[in-house]
Amino acid sequence: MEKNNKKRFVLVHGLCHGAWCWYKVKTHLEAVGHCVTAVDLAASGINMTRLEEIQTLKDYCKPLLELLNSLGSDDDKVILVAHSMGGIPAALASDIFPSKIATIVFLTAFMPDTRNLPAYVYQKLIRSVPQEGWLDTVFGTYGKHECPLEFALFGPKFMAKNLYQLSPVQDLELAKMLVRVNPIITNNLAGTRSFSEEGYGTVTRIYIVCGEDMAVPEDYQWWMIKNFPPKEVMEIKCADHMAMFSKPHKLCALLVEIACKYA
């Protein structure tokens, strides 16, 4: 691939997952000549940070922020691909480093706006889910009693029913072995300052809707799109929440298309 056509992708995972969940996408994009980095956020994947060390959203996003900070002015802008709750770390990264990001791709991801608090789009959905809907997912709190932080660990039944229901069983089994306890992005973690129009608001955003997502339902994905319209909306109609497993080839085709148009 000619240098001008070679793009740099940075992949950001969602809640309880890690860089490992991008293995199919990374392999495919690198095979066609692109540069791909999949990031483990703090206390995720093989990152050794302990949950108790994560007191702020910046703490959780530290590996992503360090990666972007390491890029020089001569480096190409990155295409930031964020999945699920990874949309909020991606928004923070673009708020801090808008000049280093060509576009953010929100893959059935929580897409914050610049009016409400960073955690708003996540908490709005979570409040609508009845407790029994979480099945065997474990929730808890940590940190200071007067300002508690929250964590979650997806249970295998919840993953099978709501995240991986259309994905290969091998990938579900992989996830059962590799998911970790992660902080939930609440106001106590993310703070009370909205993302800025001058930072996050200037970065091109693309949203990929997953039509069979049982965790972030399609109607909620469209609500976020209406709430803070992106540059373009694409769809993978038969993808579950884990589109990188259930529809990897379609997802990669869309990412290559986005790279050609916006990077």
From Swiss-Prot:
Pfam families: Abhydrolase_6
Keywords (A to Z) from UniProt: Hydrolase
Molecular function GO terms recorded: hydrolase activity, acting on ester bonds; methyl salicylate esterase activity
Keyword Hydrolase assigned: yes
Protein's pathway: Plant hormone biosynthesis
A biological process term (GO) from this entry: salicylic acid metabolic process
Name of the protein in question: Methylesterase 4
Keyword Hydrolase carried by entry: yes
EC number: 3.1.1.-
